[in-house]
Amino acid sequence: MTVGMVPGASIAGMVFSLVVSFALPIGLFVYAKKKLGAKAAPFFIGCGVFFVMVLVLEAAVHRIVFQLAGEALTGSVILYAVYGGLMAALFEETGRYIAMRFLVKPMDFPNAFMYGAGHGGVEAMLLCGVASISNIAGAVMINSGTLSAQLAALDAEKAADTAAALSALWTTSSLTFFAGGVERIIAVVLHLSLSILVFQSIRKKSQKDLLNAYLFHFVIDSLSVLLSAVASVWVVELVAALVTGGAVLMAKYACMEE
């Protein structure tokens, strides 16, 4: 396989997504600390809850379910979307509720906001930030000629496999690399909104607000999987933005209710 050049616009998209993934959480942390008077601890509690509930517990359940269900689940886009949405909502919102109910002290609006910044922020850094760093490193290797030199030292089969694995960096539309950053902005706003909903559910002892948090999380994850199979990444992000807008309005309404 011939190694192409990674367009400058693609690298710009990678850098944009990288900056968003780290600058947004840091900016929100500073804002919540300086402007809202939040404590720092809820940010790191949010980071920890995401790690434990998603990367450890949810991932373990996925391994078991996929092993048992096999293609019966992964072979159906609808079933896979429903399953993915349910698991994401169950683990993340349950973790959010437990953290806010028992760990975040005092449980007030500034600390709920700070928790959401941590939960959504660490997700951005780990999922998009790390991938962006890898993409940028690969692009630099390709454009500098380092990759071609390394491939020349491999046998034909390994060289072809390596080039194929990296080919997306020069064959993917440049705009697509900006999508990761846009997606993270939407996701962080969603996590802030869901954190406020869960906070209000605890403050007001309102099951409705908690159920809304579960529902919005399920809907956005399920729709993202479904639409990814039939539509462009920008259609997926548009729908995600609309659903997130609904979550923002619901959180605002919950704050206005007594």
Model-derived regions, located:
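Hydrophobic alpha-helical segments at protein termini of multi-pass membrane proteins
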Residues: 1-258
